């Protein structure tokens, strides 16, 4: 590597190197400043959460219903759907009718999945029985008697 090419590389990347040095230095400065300026509480209640003057009751750990995880998964799925449809909509002139048919098939497959989720009761928020039990009441009654 000749001297001129290495100088060119340094000239092109000096701003990024300075950014990295400043970012790492700022992080270290904030951590060290917090360690020096922070209080040293060695009391019995150090690890209890602060509740704005109200005595804490119970633990800080809460059990979330599985419905929250389902909603998060549905959000990610439909967010990815929106991402694909946005990419398709920006290139609609280049893709033409073939792209339109492909996008329509994509939307229909996702709508079929949504209809399936609604039919099995995956989107119901009530903790009562699911729609599977409502569709087949004979099976649910025989299961309860056993």
From Swiss-Prot:
What the protein does?
NDH-1 shuttles electrons from NADH, via FMN and iron-sulfur (Fe-S) centers, to quinones in the respiratory chain. The immediate electron acceptor for the enzyme in this species is believed to be ubiquinone. Couples the redox reaction to proton translocation (for every two electrons transferred, four hydrogen ions are translocated across the cytoplasmic membrane), and thus conserves the redox energy in a proton gradient.
Known EC number = 7.1.1.-
Q: Pfam families, from UniProt?
A: Oxidored_q4
On whether DNA repair is a keyword of this UniProt record, the answer is no
Q: Which PANTHER family match?
A: NADH-QUINONE OXIDOREDUCTASE SUBUNIT A, NADH-UBIQUINONE OXIDOREDUCTASE CHAIN 3
InterPro entries the UniProt entry points to = NAD(P)H_OxRDtase_bac/plastid, NADH_UbQ/plastoQ_OxRdtase_su3, NDAH_ubi_oxred_su3_sf
Instruction: Please report the record's description of how this protein sits within the membrane.
Output: Multi-pass membrane protein
Which GO molecular function entries does the Swiss-Prot or TrEMBL record give? Answer: NADH dehydrogenase (ubiquinone) activity; NADH:ubiquinone reductase (non-electrogenic) activity; quinone binding
Q: Which family does it belong to?
A: Belongs to the complex I subunit 3 family.
Keywords carried by this UniProt record: Cell inner membrane, Cell membrane, Membrane, NAD, Quinone, Translocase, Transmembrane, Transmembrane helix, Transport, Ubiquinone
Q: Which organism is it from?
A: Enterobacter sp. (strain 638)
Q: Subunit structure, briefly?
A: NDH-1 is composed of 13 different subunits. Subunits NuoA, H, J, K, L, M, N constitute the membrane sector of the complex.
- Write down the chemical reaction(s) this protein catalyses: a quinone + NADH + 5 H(+)(in) = a quinol + NAD(+) + 4 H(+)(out)
Record keyword Translocase present:
yes
Location in or out of the cell: Cell inner membrane
Instruction: Quote the cellular component terms of the Gene Ontology held in the record.
Output: NADH dehydrogenase complex; plasma membrane
Q: Which residues cross the membrane?
A: 16-36, 68-88, 98-118
**Predominant subcellular localization, coarse grouping:** membrane
Q: What is this protein called?
A: NADH-quinone oxidoreductase subunit A
Give the organism's phylogenetic lineage: Bacteria, Pseudomonadati, Pseudomonadota, Gammaproteobacteria, Enterobacterales
């Amino acid at each position: 590597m000749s001297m001129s090419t290495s100088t060119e590389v340094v000239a092109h990347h000096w701003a990024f190197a300075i950014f990295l040095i400043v970012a790492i230095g700022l992080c270290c400065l904030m951590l060290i400043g917090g360690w020096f300026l922070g209080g040293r509480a060695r009391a019995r209640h150090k690890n209890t959460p602060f509740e704005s003057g109200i005595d804490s009751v119970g633990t800080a750990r809460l059990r979330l219903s599985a419905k929250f995880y389902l909603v998060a998964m549905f959000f990610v799925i439909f967010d990815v759907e929106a991402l694909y449809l946005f990419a398709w909509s920006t290139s609609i002139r280049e893709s033409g009718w073939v792209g339109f048919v492909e996008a329509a098939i994509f939307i229909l497959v996702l709508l079929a999945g949504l209809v399936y989720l609604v039919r099995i009761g995956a989107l119901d928020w009530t903790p009562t029985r699911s729609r599977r039990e409502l569709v087949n009441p004979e099976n649910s009654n025989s299961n309860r008697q056993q």
